[in-house]
Amino acid sequence: PKYYFYAGTCGPVPLMDARARGTRDGFLGTLREVGELACKPCNGEHAVGFNKLGYEGGTYLINNREADADAVWRFVREHPNDIYTEFFHAGGGLERISPVVHTLRVLTVNPTATEPVLAACYLRLATGVGGDDSKPNYRPPEQAGVCSLNLRLDMDDGSFGDGRLVYGNHVVCSSLHPDTGVPCAGTIDCWPQVWELCEGLALY
């Protein structure tokens, strides 16, 4: 993603893609320009602490709820050690299943250091958040009724399906997304490019 700001203890610190200073006006101007920012802890896990800031039609948004400029700036000051980046949307054909960004888990092996091999992968789609893309795309299945949706992914052609709802103490087969009711089967449109990216990361 593009990196805009790091929330330091004295205010936002501009990062490589910011074209503004780390001031109130600079931060708010960037938000107005790009429209959406993902906000997440600089060193976190399990999507804990994920938030979304937005600006649309002359209105500021915090987690898709209307706010004013003062509220947005207060939010920034109250979230030190967070990083503000480009906000991703689901794509590659997966947006028809759920608008919330998905996760592709990939394992590569590279025994020769020059020829990485895709060894295993699966897709994980967010559940329990409806269509609200400001919510974390993963909730650990530690409470009753909380699950993640995992899909088998064919490494050769990017086709996916054979869904499993993974709860803390059991697994349920599911061909439909539990929030949207849409069938969880298809093919990632840009699979060759996805594999090329994974290969590049493995060679880095």
Protein language model annotation of sequence segments:
Residues T23-R24, D68, V194:
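Amphipathic coiled-coil/heptad-repeat helices and related helical stalk/stem segments
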Residues P1, I83, L197-L201:
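Amphipathic alpha-helical segments that form well-ordered structural scaffolds
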Residues D156-P178:
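A glycine-rich, aromatic-flanked flexible loop/lid motif
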Residues V13-L15, G93-E95, A185:
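A generic structural signal for short coil/turn motifs at secondary-structure boundaries
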Residues P1-L61:
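A conserved helix-loop-beta module that forms one wall/lid of the active-site cleft
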Residues E33-G35, C42-N43, V48, N63-R164:
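Phosphate-binding site of ATP-dependent enzymes
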Residues R96, V101, P111-L118, H170-Y204:
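ATP-dependent carboxylate activation and anion-phosphoryl transfer catalytic cores
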